[in-house]
């Protein structure tokens, strides 16, 4: 957006990306304008709203139930697993959660008899809905509107003239339209055709912005008929049960919520009833739709409010919940310590990729990479496991026979330490999940054009950290397939036959690809034409021209023919291989070939 000056149509490598509204991208671009283009600047808006939603939940709880309950609601929100886990990736859901929470609070403030300024809160309600439309489109209005409808119906206020008078619906609608319509109109005008009612979504079809954004992305996605089918769905039962993990450790107190009063006879009862409508609609909605694990995040504040209200009651259910937490924390501590003992003598050559399996079919789910873990892989995670063991011991000891306040403090402290372990684990996974090491290696080599193989998102960090335009090999698929079909799509896509011509040119090219593509590329280009510049996390950087510190890729059975005069890099001569690093040549490649599917791992790229 900053480079092109086009703040209407989001683009990936110049290709129109019409799936999502632009507000989160505007925030990132503004952050870049202020702080410069850095990865932390991109994440800053998300981090601020993550803090903001915790503070907003606490303020909502204080208004509804008092200071202690509000504090506990904020504590639940800020230390639950779900909020931490699903804000490690840059998605707008936490900002959407903020706008929905604000709209729910504003609705109650509008309807409150002793509220001195209901008109202002009606405008806050409308503004939050309009802002949400620019974050994640229709669900930003559907969720709070449906929850509010159920609440008004349950409290017999739906057909009350007083209710609608205080809500100022016409002024509110004008505010919503004023905030959201200009971008939708501009996006439609800049991405024609303007109108289509086709209910078919398939490859090569292009119907403009309006059809794609509303019919393909909203209706057909809900009906599981959307193309491209680049998403998966969590089984319904697991979608519900996973909330025991997302709300951990506070989910042990959920049974205590059942003892609360939901009668709207006082402010606390009204908030609980609205929270119930709020949670219920979101969970039921996604029960009948395709869903990811994090889709229910907008319901977390409502769950936190109910838990905060239950935690001040200190009922017998709270005591039983604390006992359950003691047992769970003890079992987790024992499991983590067992892993540390089992892996105490396991070697950890290279990065964690060496010890992982591959389940690409699961990667469209947020936790898909968890299936890649093996017993050996935990040896690379010794420090995170140690911190996790300490965390669970804090939880087990701190909650044992503890009074509620002490137990809540111990649970919160447990999560703070656990999150530090999770952060260290993410650093360990960085070479596998990120391509930053490859980008840094490219920047230390002679200038050349950059090609990424297949999926843009797999190597998006290469584009970010090198700040170079890309050519995409077979990349007109998944999220880029629709933009690639546009009449004005940039010529940034290559296919295998074109790569053969490009690779033979005198101009230098770099190709970033996965180790799984070696057989295909060797058959297509020839092994002697693949000069390895870097390897990290199962990904290679090749160049079409020889570099003094480049090597040949490892042999792949049935595809290799040794180049005269160059070492064929067999398993017996692996010690002769040298892999380029950002600082020069790394002579310490491991001498043991580590087996991966179809490939013998013989070389390492290390920082």
List the predicted regions and their residue ranges:
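Membrane-integral, polyisoprenol-dependent glycosyltransferases
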Residues: 1-320, 339-343, 379
């Amino acid at each position: 957006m900053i480079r092109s000056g086009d703040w209407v149509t989001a683009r990936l490598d110049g290709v129109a990306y019409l799936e999502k509204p632009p507000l989160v991208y505007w925030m990132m671009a503004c952050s870049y304008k202020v702080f410069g283009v850095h990865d932390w600047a991109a994440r800053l808006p998300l981090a601020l709203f993550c803090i903001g939603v915790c503070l907003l939940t606490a303020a909502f709880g204080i208004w509804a139930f008092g200071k202690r309950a509000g504090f506990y609601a904020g504590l639940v929100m800020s230390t639950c697993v779900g909020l931490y886990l699903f804000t490690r990736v840059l998605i707008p859901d936490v900002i959407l959660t903020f706008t929905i929470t604000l709209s729910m609070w504003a609705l109650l403030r509008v309807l409150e008899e002793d509220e001195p300024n209901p008109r202002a809160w009606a405008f806050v309600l409308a503004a939050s809905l309009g802002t949400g439309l620019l974050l994640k489109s229709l669900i930003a209005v559907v969720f709070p509107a449906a929850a509010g409808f159920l609440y008004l119906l349950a409290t017999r206020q739906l057909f009350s003239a007083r209710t609608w008078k205080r809500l100022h619906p016409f002024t509110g609608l004008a505010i919503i339209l004023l905030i959201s319509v200009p971008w939708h109109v501009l996006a439609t005008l800049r991405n024609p055709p303007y109108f289509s009612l086709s209910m078919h979504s398939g490859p090569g079809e292009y119907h403009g912005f309006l059809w794609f954004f509303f019919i393909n992305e909203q209706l057909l996605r809900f009906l599981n008929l959307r193309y491209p089918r680049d998403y998966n769905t969590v089984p319904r039962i697991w979608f519900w049960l996973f909330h025991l993990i997302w709300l951990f450790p506070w989910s042990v107190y959920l049974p205590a919520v059942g003892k609360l009063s939901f009668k709207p006879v006082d402010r606390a009862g009204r908030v609980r009833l609205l929270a119930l409508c709020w949670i219920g609609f979101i969970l039921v909605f996604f029960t009948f739709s395709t869903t990811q694990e994090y889709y229910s995040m907008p319901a977390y504040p409502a769950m936190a409010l109910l838990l905060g209200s239950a935690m001040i009651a200190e009922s017998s259910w709270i005591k039983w919940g604390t006992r359950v937490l003691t047992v769970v924390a003890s079992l987790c501590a024992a499991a983590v310590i067992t892993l540390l003992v089992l892996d105490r003598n396991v070697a950890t050559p290279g990065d964690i990729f060496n010890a992982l399996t591959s389940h690409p079919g699961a990667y469209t789910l947020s936790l898909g990479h968890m299936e890649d873990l093996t017993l050996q892989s935990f040896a690379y995670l010794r420090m995170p496991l140690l911190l996790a063991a300490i965390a669970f011991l804090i939880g087990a000891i701190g909650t044992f026979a503890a009074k509620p306040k002490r137990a809540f403090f111990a649970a919160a402290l447990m999560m703070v330490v656990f999150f530090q372990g999770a952060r260290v684990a993410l650093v360990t996974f960085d070479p596998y999940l990120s391509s930053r090491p490859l980008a840094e290696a490219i920047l230390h080599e002679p200038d050349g054009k950059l090609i990424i193989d297949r999926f843009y998102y797999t190597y998006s960090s290469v584009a970010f950290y090198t700040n170079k335009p890309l050519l995409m090999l077979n990349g007109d698929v998944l999220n880029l397939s629709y933009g690639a079909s546009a009449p004005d799509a940039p010529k940034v896509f290559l296919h295998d036959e074109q790569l053969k011509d490009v690779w033979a040119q005198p101009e230098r090219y770099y190709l970033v690809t996965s180790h799984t593509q070696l057989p295909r590329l060797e058959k297509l280009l020839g092994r002697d034409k693949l000069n390895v510049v870097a390897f990290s996390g199962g990904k290679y950087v090749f160049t079409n021209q020889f570099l003094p510190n480049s090597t040949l890729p490892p042999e792949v059975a049935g595809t290799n023919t040794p180049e005269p005069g160059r070492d064929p890099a067999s398993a017996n001569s692996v010690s002769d291989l040298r892999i380029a690093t950002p600082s020069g040549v790394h002579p310490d490649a491991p001498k043991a070939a580590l087996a991966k599917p179809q490939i013998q791992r013989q070389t390492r790229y290390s920082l």
